Amino acid sequence: MERVERSAIRVEPFSSYLERRRTGPIFPVVTAGGFVFVSGLPPFDPATGEASRRPFREQAQITLEQMKRCLEAAGSSLERVVECNIYCTDAARFDEFNEVFARYFPSGSPARIFLCVGAFPGSFDLEVDCIAVL
């Protein structure tokens, strides 16, 4: 089997947060085969770099802004996202999330799922990952 070349990209404050909480190399963004893979991002507090509980709409906006920042660090953009996965602790937040999401994808949504999960290991309600074309 042919080896796939991957490049990990550091994006602060996300990289430092992941390193403080996990063992082993974990990166918020990896590129491979002409694609950008953004790891699941909770809503990091921009001032502290820590995941924190905020009102849900604010969590959604912060998370999507972070995703945009990660994509741009890799040389891509929201317009090049082909798949987006949303993990949320409350299915009743579906419409509320969609209102925020639509502002980031005004010309049409990528393929996506909105999955309800039990809980996260932190004080937040939302995590988003995506795949984009370079």
Q: Which residues are covered by each model-predicted region?
A:
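N-terminal presequence-like segments and the immediate start of the first folded domain
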Residues: 1-65, 69-82, 88-134
